[in-house]
Design a protein with these regions (language model features):
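Alpha-helical interface subdomain recognition
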Residues: 1-94, 106-111, 118, 122, ...
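Short glycine/proline-enriched turns and hinge-like loops at secondary-structure junctions
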Residues: 69, 138-140, 164-168, 205-207, ...
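Helix-loop "lid/cap" segments that line or gate small-molecule binding pockets
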Residues: 97-105
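A short, Trp-centered hydrophobic/proline-enriched beta-strand micro-motif
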Residues: 122-130
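Short Gly/Pro-enriched turn/cap motifs at secondary-structure boundaries
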Residues: 134-137, 161-164, 176, 201-208
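Flexible, small-/acidic-enriched active-site or ligand-binding loops
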Residues: 141, 189-220
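A short core secondary-structure module
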Residues: 156-195
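A short, charged helix-loop
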Residues: 210-236
Length: 382
């Protein structure tokens, strides 16, 4: 490739806007994904099993301990991980944004000392117990309750669609108290705490998804996160997770784009490569344009996040835009692959099915549109 020939997956050389350290990190993570995740991604998805052996490798790469990294660097980690598989990126996102982050920001010194080293090393797995069956988007309607009894809290309720639920050593559980929403740390062996995995998923099959039941689970006062009260706490955690998702979706899109680009260049039909036809080139060009737009968007928001000027609605527009972009590319790529596009020998169908979950979790596309609409109009349509 000549110096002036654009890189197909970075057509406008967005990587030139990265620092040397950021580029080096992305290259290191790309190598890790190529060597450790891609070789097991298809079989993990086919078997519906989370590859727990990858946790040690992820910890060695430092993805659970991002101390010293800026937000762009963290985004690049998410992008490369999802180029491998959404399920594994989801595991990392939950461990970081939804477990480590609330303990670090809202927890006591003792809670931080106990759990942060274990989470960073991968010796402990966490989950974020927020969603409930009566409506994941309506947090104010939370039915899980925590009632004070002496110096303890008693938690009763049910959480659904919880990533890492049955394999977690510690759960960050959100419950309504008489003073509003609070977060509690519940260990896996607590009396009355039960989990059951959601089976027969056609999406995110390399990720553990569980229902959690709290039947009078008693925890001490020391297990409440003391520095947070109200729904602003879980919403802040979700904003951080959505930021990583917006980056991760680009990785899935790139994986599908690279696969279909190679396929159409090699596939001979009616005496010429598929890529020699106008319709195919136009579809490939559209994919490249949309990937470039997404890359520029999250890079800019990452710089804003580092500067402390990022608004949560800007993260909503990025999650909405980038996941929709990736889902559309995966569907179009699957179509262009023809019959082989439905085989797990090709990564596109796996990414496409996974993205059907990503467009739903951490706020549906509709919710993010309404978040943006509220900021534009000053009116709440929820």
């Amino acid at each position: 490739m000549s110096q002036n020939t654009p890189n197909p997956v970075d057509f406008c050389n967005v990587s030139s806007l990265l620092s040397n350290d950021e580029r080096a990190l992305q290259q290191r993570m790309a190598t890790f994904v190529n060597e450790k995740i891609i070789p097991i991604a298809a079989s993990s998805f086919d078997d519906g099993v989370f590859p727990r052996e990858i946790i040690t490798d992820l910890a060695k790469e430092g993805v659970f301990d991002c101390t010293g990294l800026n937000n762009v660097a963290y985004g690049l980690i998410c992008q490369e991980l999802e180029r491998g598989d959404t399920g594994i990126r989801t595991f990392v996102s939950v461990q970081n944004s939804l477990v480590t982050q609330p303990i670090a920001e809202f927890g006591s010194d003792a809670q931080r000392k106990t759990w942060l080293p274990k989470l960073a090393s991968g010796d402990a797995i966490g989950c974020f117990a927020l969603t409930e069956e009566q409506g994941g988007s309506d947090l104010a309607n939370m039915q899980t309750k925590a009632v004070k009894e002496g110096t303890d809290w008693v938690i009763t309720g049910k959480k659904v669609w919880i990533t890492n639920g049955s394999i977690a050593d510690i759960a960050v559980v959100w419950a309504m108290t008489e003073d509003g929403c609070r977060a509690f740390l519940v260990e896996k062996n607590a009396n009355g705490f039960m989990t059951s995995d959601i089976e027969n998923k056609y999406s995110l099959r390399a990720s553990v998804t569980s229902n959690l039941t709290f039947d009078g689970v008693r925890v001490s006062e020391e297990m409440m996160l003391p520095n947070m009260q109200g729904l602003a706490g879980p919403l802040k955690c979700l904003t951080n997770a959505r930021y990583g998702i917006a980056w991760g979706a680009i990785g899935a899109a790139i994986a599908c784009f690279e696969e279909v680009l190679t396929h159409t260049q090699k596939r001979i039909l009616f005496g010429q490569p598929l890529a020699a036809t106008q319709s195919i080139q136009m579809r490939l060009a559209e994919m490249s344009r949309n990937i470039t737009t997404a890359q520029l968007l999250v890079l800019h928001l990452g710089r804003m996040k580092d500067a402390g000027t990022l608004h949560h609605a800007q993260v909503s527009i990025a999650k909405w835009n980038n996941v929709r972009m990736a889902l559309d590319i995966s569907r179009d790529a699957r179509d262009m692959l023809g019959a082989v596009g439905v085989s797990s020998d090709h990564c596109t169908i796996r990414h496409m099915l996974n993205l059907e979950t990503v467009v739903t979790y951490e706020g549906t596309e509709t919710v993010h549109k309404l978040v943006v609409g509220r900021e534009l109009t000053g009116l709440n349509a929820f």
